């Protein structure tokens, strides 16, 4: 509770009426909206928060999505840094659809293949210890290919262009120092 907020009624020895809102009760702060910092080729650089709560990330949308006939929400790949939490290069993918449970989604960068795990429509590297290897591979390759099976059994492929990803990651690192 901030220094200007009034303590809730129960802390003042009064019983609060649960049917009536307490106008003096502290309200939760509004969520912090990310700010666009830079755009390098297909990669946006964003930052949110301040101090130890600051987070920076790079984000891109796929250049190609297959099969083209499937209707789905937009997809994205994120690489996040949260220095205050000791997080660097956290990789996540939004597929735009729910991924089939117990399937084996994967990310391919050049000759390297990285197994992923799914929860709903989101993917993360199965082995977080590979995040640095994943990011180093991104810096050296022209494309990232993410493959996953939908709940309906469709195998989907999202292809991301990697031109500029290294500069975008460097910019995010600088922003989050």
Q: Where are the predicted features?
A:
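A generic "folded-domain core" signal
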Residues: 10-177
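Sec-dependent N-terminal signal peptides
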Residues: 1-12
